[in-house]
């Protein structure tokens, strides 16, 4: 690798920008990882302290942290655990609450097909860790998940967590030990003992080194009735979930709008938290609270915006260093 110092810096900044775009993760989604970590006697307090995660947040399932922080948390857990299949083993801790309101919506659907139809509209409530796609394959169907995280090791464990949790939760919903036809994993073929572990969880043909991460199963399973469904409760939960998705999207827009306003205001000098809150017609405290709910804080957004502007100026290379420092 013959990258110059400047190229390496640019690449590092590009990766940092990618990490900044990891969205959010619900506290509910984090719990599975922490339950396995506690079972393995990992030092969760020390890990949270190292990455700057406030443990108080973790007691409220309605809260969110940034995707970047979630990725750091999983990386830190993996570094401390000797479990090569940590992600796969988290699936045993899945419960309706792991999927936020989506979990309770799923419980009140009529059948498995209806459950799957609810994933895409509401998966944002669980977090922005990945995107689910669902496609027919003749007499079979394929449900695949594309992880949006950037750390390859974290991604592998997240994929295992996601697919194994889906299957474990689906079996719980229908009280029926149906097995998929095939599991496709992008990871390379692991050791024989690890292959046996995948086999024990999924109980089907497992293909490694694939171009996607997906579960394939018979179409007939979509009509399996759920043993716990309540259609009246379902519509109430869906209305609630729709308003939560709307609020989450609005809050993400707040962060984007704030970045835009900061960029404008850095040129005028009125860029303090109080100034920004006034622009949005809210108090500084409210702004602080809404940013905290996104796993963000005002100072880090200000620093990021300054850095982005400096990089933009450097890229244009028409401004000399004196002009940059004066801003």
What do the predicted segments below correspond to?
Residues 50-54, 186, 327:
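Short acidic/histidine-centered micro-motifs embedded in hydrophobic/aromatic stretches
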Residues 74, 116, 163-166, 262:
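Hydrophobic alpha-helical core bundles mediating ligand binding, dimerization, or RNAP-core interactions
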Residues 1-143, 179:
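N-terminal low-complexity or simple alpha-helical regulatory segments
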Residues 100-106, 148-152, 222-223, 243-245:
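Short hinge/gating elements
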């Amino acid at each position: 690798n013959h990258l110059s110092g400047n190229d390496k810096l640019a690449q590092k900044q590009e990766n940092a920008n990618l990490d900044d775009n990891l969205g959010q993760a619900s506290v509910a989604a984090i719990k599975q990882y922490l339950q396995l970590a506690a079972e393995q006697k990992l030092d969760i307090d020390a890990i949270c302290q190292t990455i700057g995660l406030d443990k108080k947040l973790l007691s409220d399932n309605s809260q969110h942290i940034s995707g970047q922080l979630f990725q750091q948390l999983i990386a830190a857990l993996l570094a401390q655990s000797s479990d090569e299949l940590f992600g796969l083993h988290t699936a045993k801790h899945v419960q309706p609450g792991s999927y936020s309101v989506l979990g309770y919506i799923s419980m009140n659907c009529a059948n498995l097909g209806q459950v799957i139809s609810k994933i895409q509209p509401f998966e944002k409530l669980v977090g922005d860790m990945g995107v689910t796609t669902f496609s027919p394959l003749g007499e079979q169907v394929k449900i695949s998940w594309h992880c949006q995280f950037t750390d390859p090791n974290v991604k592998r464990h997240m994929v295992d967590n996601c697919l194994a949790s889906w299957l474990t939760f689906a079996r719980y919903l229908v009280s029926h030990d149906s097995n998929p036809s095939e599991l496709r994993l992008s990871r390379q073929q692991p050791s024989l003992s690890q292959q046996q572990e995948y086999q024990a969880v999924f109980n089907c043909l497992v293909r490694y080194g694939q171009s996607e991460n997906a579960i394939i199963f018979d179409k007939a399973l979509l009509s399996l009735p759920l043993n716990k469904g309540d259609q009246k409760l379902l519509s109430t939960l869906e209305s609630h979930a729709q308003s939560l998705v709307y609020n989450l999207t609005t809050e993400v827009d707040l962060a984007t709008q704030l970045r835009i306003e900061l960029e404008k205001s850095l040129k005028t000098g009125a860029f303090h938290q109080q100034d920004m809150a006034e622009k949005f017609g809210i108090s500084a405290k409210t702004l602080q609270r809404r940013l905290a709910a996104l796993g963000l804080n005002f100072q880090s957004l200000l620093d990021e915006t300054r850095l982005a502007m400096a990089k933009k100026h450097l890229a244009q290379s028409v401004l000399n260093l004196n002009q940059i420092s004066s801003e």
